[in-house]
Amino acid sequence: MAQVIVGARNRLNRALDPVTSGMAAVSARREYRWTLIALVAIAALVFPRFQSQSYQIDAAVEAETFVLLALGLNIVIGYAGLLDLGYAAFFAIGALTMAWLGSPHFAISAHSFSSPFVSYGPQGIFVNFYLMIPIAAIAAAFCGVLFGAPTLRLRGDYLAIVTLGFGEIVPRVMQNLGPGNALGWPDITGGVNALSGIESPPTLNFASVHADFVGGASRAPWYYLGLIMIAFSIVVIMSLRESKLGRAWAAIREDEVAAAHMGINITRTRLLAFGLGAAFSGFAGVLEAARLGSVFYTTFSFNVSITILVMVILGGMGSIPGVILGAIIMSYLNILWLGDISAKINEVGGNFENGPSIIGSFGHWMHNVDLASATPLLFGLILLFTMLLRPQGLWPSTTRARELAPATGEILEEENEELWTDRS
């Protein structure tokens, strides 16, 4: 009898070994994940204290703007599987909404009136910056649904072409609705002169925090404002991903026909993807317009849409940390690193410029290299090599990593571990 009990216990232990090892692996991965998140959060918080130049903080704030944009596009492409090549249009709509309601452009003659959130006077309508954030997000979301409606029956390349058209139409319309426009309408957008005089966020004073966005010597308040907006966006997007809507997005991304047979409302699900993705673009537009104090419509070109797309693909579609990583890399590459690399190449080329014929010619070429002017080419090459060498991205979600990785024993082991953990 004792031998039977011992044998049964041994068989039970062998059966439970995969379970216990899987749970131990999950526990280790979660501990590593939270440690990494804590280290990144600490590094982000202390970053401005180690930057002596204001342009470095400005570069970080611009990178934060693109992080917001990439997070929004990730909803459309990474979660719902809808290719949107006109995403910069919603960026423009958010910035334009901020410019309309936060600059002297809409001057009125009504008597002066003030409230904690809105002030009316001869200089225009000025809505409090913090109230403008949800207003611009709602405006961009409405336009996202409006532009998404005609694409409901389109798939793949056809969807991409139509969204590309919308992305080109919006900035062109804004440029042509300025003073003296062909329609005879009043100046709505400022035209080629754009809109300027946009108000910055009001100074914050609470507890030991003093954030002056205008008169302060430091650009750090802008950086921390962007950090707060990113943190809020991540929380909202993670909640959406784990919700019923997020599962519906995953279903239509994998097989729209099967999703429809399971009772998922395809029209509603797709429109919500376009609308919510556009909302985060409008979110970023408010930050950009307030930081620069003006809106130039040439900023919202097709190149911007492609840049954001490259960020999402490089980092890993469907992966929040991957998208953030891709946005930071591409932003700094565009803002700082290409210029620094060009300067080093120019310096080396200057040393060989007066050499023998071939060396001198090559040195002259190096001395005049400007990588910043070849940004579209470089970004295209990055996109090409990413798709060829690492299609899942630098930091993919576990789901996409399994889809695109070869079926090796290592991958199968990760799949077994995934049974006991959440999606990243």
Labelled PLM ranges:
Residues 2-424:
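Transmembrane alpha-helices and adjacent helix-loop boundaries
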